[in-house]
Amino acid sequence: MTEREAMFYPELAKDDSLALHTDLYEINMMYTYFKKGIADRNAVFESFYRREPFGNGYAVYAGLEHIINYLKNLKFTESDLQYLKENEGYDDDFIDYLRNLKLKLTIRSMKEGEQL
């Protein structure tokens, strides 16, 4: 986390790992891909919102730096892995896969500040 992000997101600065700050569905899908042997295939994911904020009919794109930093630093800590194993029942092979996870990404994005 950058110093700037820590200033604007102080609650996140307390947490070494944001890997579990997701819907369990996403981790279940990772597990399914892993068990089917397709975890390393290319995949496409999107980040979006459902409605314009504040009901004003438009939005301004912001936050790309935050997304890039999150993805660059994404890792599962040992406490994350222990939680997933003990509470969600994932097997040791998947836990090891998460422990050694290295993302290979191409990010396509709107420009920061563009109106949506």
Language-model features: locations:
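Ordered alpha/beta subdomains of enzyme catalytic regions
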Residues: 1-116
